[in-house]
Amino acid sequence: TKISGIPAVLLEVVDREDPIEVGETVTYEIAVTNQGSAEDTNIIVVAEMDPEMQYVSDAGPTKGNVNGRRIEFAPLPQLGVGEKKIWLLTVKAAAAGDFRIRVNMDTDQLTRPVMETEATNFYTTPK
């Protein structure tokens, strides 16, 4: 048996700012990197927000389709060896507390999805 290469895809999710005041926005950076020795195909990224987050916008190599608290990005056809793609998801803080965004990634070569969670603290300033 000859193995010509294996894709190894890394999913990272980080908030660009934390904590965030209620009413303000925070942008999450969703990075997918192919650390393997073969390309990966049909990369699907799905983000799910807590109810206290309101969708504002998204940007990246594929467009997001918003369905309630779920943002499904259109599939990325391929990710070459050593290649990295970044999606940006901006949300508005709607209530005070410690909240999460959950991101799932699946590809043709993965046997099961990869999941990452990022916590962000939303606060209010006393008046």
Residue spans of the language-model regions?
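Exported/extracytosolic protein signature
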Residues: 1-127
